[in-house]
Curated annotation (Swiss-Prot):
GO-annotated biological processes: mRNA splicing, via spliceosome; positive regulation of viral genome replication; protein folding; regulation of DNA-templated transcription
Species of origin: Mus musculus (Mouse)
Gene: Ppie
Cystine pairings recorded for this chain: none
SUPFAM superfamilies: Cyclophilin-like (SSF50891), RNA-binding domain, RBD (SSF54928)
Protein name stated in the entry: Peptidyl-prolyl cis-trans isomerase E
């Protein structure tokens, strides 16, 4: 019983998908113990589905929430628990989810991904373009001083888009200033995946399972106006729709498969080189090579 809750059925796969792509797409949710892609021996190609086994049932559940009905290589995939005797592609719960896809390979190969989201890009461009002129005056700027191992790596300066997502921006600003009595100082980037993202913000458990917002609980996705268009964008990590706390990630590349699932609320204005140093400490499974810490943080007044 326990095993079945750890094994996922992944259907609707494109021909290009192999075990490496699936590993990269699902590893952000937890440790993977096995991946099987059944072959059609006549064509010597896979049959369009696979099984992914996680070490923990809760990680498998998070993967379902985040990956079901997401895109991989331009195809919408279905992700649900594998049934013991008969594998059905029955839908689990539709979810836009997040941290997910945190899936770099999924996104990297998904450049045609926008076809399905056709109506959205024009809307995003129009709305993103307008507030830009007022950024400097109305939007707060915060910073993080980063330490890698025992050495200072430099400062990352970020502009928070309170003109677009005021509630999300205010949460992050207060966690940088510690004006509510808690925040990011002394916490670490616990998950770093090169060419994808650097995730931090868990200042309670320091492993991706904790953190809290200034609102005392999880808060809703404010909107998805801003998009994951390139490196240096600041976005909320989550465990499904409307589960924002304090965890965040900085993109290392374009990650447009996260659009509509994670709330983008800021961008790096200085210190992209420091972000690249953080990225260099990452690995395919997300475990940092050495500790990457937020030694100090605050707001520019």
């Amino acid at each position: 019983m326990a095993t079945t809750k750890r094994v996922l059925y992944v259907g609707g796969l494109a021909e290009e998908v192999d075990d490496k792509v699936l590993h990269a797409a699902f590893i952000p949710f937890g440790d993977i113990t096995d991946i099987q892609i059944p072959l059609d021996y006549e064509t010597e190609k896979h049959r369009g589905f696979a099984f992914v086994e996680f070490e923990l049932a809760e990680d498998a559940a998070a993967a379902i929430d985040n990956m079901n009905e997401s895109e991989l290589f331009g195809r919408t995939i279905r992700v649900n628990l594998a049934k013991p005797m008969r594998i059905k592609e029955g839908s689990s719960r539709p979810v836009w989810s997040d941290d997910d896809w945190l899936k770099k390979f999924s996104g990297k190969t998904l450049e045609e991904n926008k076809e399905e989201e056709g109506p959205e890009p024009p809307k995003a461009e129009a709305q993103e373009g307008e507030p830009t002129a007022k950024k400097a005056r109305s939007n707060p700027q915060v910073y993080m001083d980063i330490k890698i191992g025992n050495k200072p790596a430099g400062r990352i300066q970020m502009l928070l888009r309170s003109d677009v997502v005021p509630m999300t921006a205010e949460n992050f600003r207060c966690l940088c200033t510690h004006e509510k009595g808690f925040g990011f100082k002394g916490s670490s980037f616990h998950r770093i995946i090169p060419q994808f993202m650097c995730q931090g913000g868990d200042f309670t458990n320091h492993n991706g399972t904790g953190g809290k917002s200034i609102y005392g609980k999880k808060f809703d996705d404010e909107n998805f106006i801003l998009k994951h268009t390139g490196p240096g964008l600041l976005s909320m990590a989550n465990s499904g729709p409307n589960t924002n706390g304090s965890q965040f990630f900085l993109t290392c590349d374009k990650t447009d498969w996260l659009d509509g699932k994670h709330v983008v609320f800021g961008e790096v204005t200085e210190g992209l080189d420091v972000l690249r140093q953080i990225e260099a400490q990452g690995s395919k499974d997300g475990k940092p090579k050495q500790k990457v810490m937020i030694a100090d943080c605050g707001e520019y007044m």
